[in-house]
Amino acid sequence: MELELRFFATFREVVGQKSIYWRVDDDATVGDVLRSLEAEYDGLAGRLIEDGEVKPHVNVLKNGREVVHLDGMATALDDGDAVSVFPPVAGG
């Protein structure tokens, strides 16, 4: 199946595009996608996953819903889903 992956801020700089289309197995989960991104892009290695979960302060959304409110890393994906990945944001 094919997903649209959307990147923001520093993650967009690493990937070099604001969105890409990514082919995954039909039974892929959010965790599978994040692991494959860390393997594909050196600048993302160690920045998405910590202790088997989405790293604290990183926001991952499936079709606009935060995956921490779904099934986390085990969130199932469907063909055509949009997965958005936001780096930690600080402000004042």
Swiss-Prot record:
UniProt xrefs under InterPro entries: Beta-grasp_dom_sf (IPR012675), MoaD_arc-typ (IPR010038), Mopterin_synth/thiamin_S_b (IPR016155), SAMP1_3 (IPR054834), Sulfur_Carrier/Prot_Modifier (IPR052045), ThiS/MoaD-like (IPR003749)
Residues recorded as bearing Glycyl adenylate in the entry: 92
Keyword annotations from UniProtKB, A to Z: Isopeptide bond, Nucleotide-binding, Phosphoprotein, Ubl conjugation, Ubl conjugation pathway
Induction details: Up-regulated by the addition of dimethyl sulfoxide to aerobically growing cells. These conditions also increase the levels of SAMP3 conjugates in cells.
GO molecular function, one term: nucleotide binding
SUPFAM superfamilies documented for this protein: MoaD/ThiS (SSF54285)
Crosslink feature (Glycyl lysine isopeptide (Gly-Lys) (interchain with K-? in acceptor proteins)) location: 92
Phenotype of null mutants: Cells lacking this gene grow similarly to wild-type in the presence of either DMSO or oxygen as the terminal electron acceptor; thus, SAMP3 is not needed for DMSO respiration, suggesting that it is not required for molybdenum cofactor (MoCo) biosynthesis. tRNA thiolation is not affected.
Keyword Nucleotide-binding: yes
Entries under Pfam families matching the protein: ThiS
Residues in cross-link Glycyl lysine isopeptide (Lys-Gly) (interchain with G-Cter in SAMP3): 18, 55, 62
Post-translational modification remark: The C-terminal glycine is likely acyl-adenylated (-COAMP) by UbaA.
Protein role: Functions as a protein modifier covalently attached to lysine residues of substrate proteins. The protein modification process is termed sampylation and involves the formation of an isopeptide bond between the SAMP3 C-terminal glycine carboxylate and the epsilon-amino group of lysine residues on target proteins. Seems to be able to form polymeric chains with itself at Lys-18, Lys-55 and Lys-62, similar to ubiquitin and other ubiquitin-like proteins. SAMP3 appears not to serve as a proteolytic signal in the cell to target proteins for degradation by proteasomes.
Record's subunit section: Monomer.
Protein's UniProt name: Small archaeal modifier protein 3
Organism the protein comes from: Haloferax volcanii (strain ATCC 29605 / DSM 3757 / JCM 8879 / NBRC 14742 / NCIMB 2012 / VKM B-1768 / DS2) (Halobacterium volcanii)
Species lineage: Archaea, Methanobacteriati, Methanobacteriota, Stenosarchaea group, Halobacteria
The encoding gene: samp3
